[in-house]
Amino acid sequence: MEIKRCGSQPSHKGPADWFTGRVRVDPLFQANAPARASGASVTFEPGARTAWHTHPLGQSLIVTAVCGWAQRDGGPIEEIPPGDVSQLAPNEKHWRRAD
């Protein structure tokens, strides 16, 4: 068993080629083989957003605070309020932003 203590892993600014606006990424856990799942807490300042992107294995996102918005390629912009879970299929092109 491995325990990651709160605050023990360094935060970093979201990279400019992935995000527009102020975004902070706090790692929670990395995948340990054979697992492939990792997790992070990503904080968007109001108006910040991701670039259009995909995830080869899909992605699950839990909205924990403030209202977010998401759009998949060819789809409508959808609201994702706190408590909602957004799941994407592998390679589904999308973006997300916060208000």
Give the ranges of each region predicted by the language model.
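Conserved short histidine dyad/triad with adjacent acidic residue
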Residues: 24-27, 38-55, 90-91
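Asparagine-centered strand-capping/turn motif at beta-strand->loop junctions
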Residues: 97-99
